Amino acid sequence: MRLPKLLLILCLCAAGPAAADPLDDALAASRKGDYATALRLWRPLADQGNAVAQYNIGYMYDEGLGVPRDDTAAVQWYRKAADQGHARAQSNLGALYERGEGVPQDFAAALQWYRKAAEQGHATAQYNLGIMYGTGRGVPRDYAAAVPWYLKAAAQGLAVAQYNLGVLYGEGLGVPQDFAAALLWYGKAAEQGYPRAQNNLGMMYARGQGVLADYLQAYKWFGLAAQRYDESEKQSRDNALRNRDVAATRMTPAQIAEAQKLVQEWKPRSDGSKP
């Protein structure tokens, strides 16, 4: 099974409601693109041990926002925040260890930092920990061990984790094969606009796996997938279009028109939770 690329969510971290004014002022400046002011305000706080400021400076170096991109500096600042239990810093530090950016590549260290963040409920870290088990990075490949972490991330609405669960249930990897469960998880990711899930959901409707065969629904999901693949995924988009056209051979003109209308009217929706 080919799993998607690692998903790294990097976002500037706001302080809580009782935060000191400089944190809020720095965040406001960063949102306006005034990274020099943000860095000037965050730096003394970070030097005093403020984990939020440390994380945000790490992010600026990670992304090259207002400073030259510097993975080594990003690692240093993320580590300061991570050592204080900052979950996003732990997750991003794990990703840098996994990719070998700013530090020598070290899957064991990546696993350690992902786990720290995952145990705090960080959805991206939970997903990445599942990836580590599912691909055998730093640990023996173990789909069964990946499943609980994907479930935790999926329960928080992370579409790529929902998609991976669909794959595992559909293929019977780490869990008994269960087309109904695969359909459920593909559906959750598809409704959020994740194109791989949309294509696979279309395939399940076309094949009648976990549901009665429904070519109208298959056409709809194939069509939506084709629309949402980006330019770097031309082959996947072309495959979705071919799948849609095959489904169309089993449909009446009226059904095709109805399916096309569904595609036009469809809008992605959140499942009500955020990672």
Language model segments and positions:
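N-terminal signal peptide c-region/cleavage motif recognized by signal peptidases
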Residues: A15-P17
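Short helix-capping/linker turns of helical repeat alpha-solenoids
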Residues: A29, G33-D34, D47-N50, E63-L65, ...
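Hydrophobic face of amphipathic alpha-helices that form TPR/SEL1-like repeat modules
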Residues: P22-A29, L41-L45, N56-E63, V67, ...
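Terminal, low-structured helical/coil segments at or just beyond the last alpha-helical repeat
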Residues: Q227, E233-P275
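Sec-dependent signal peptide recognition
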Residues: R2-I9
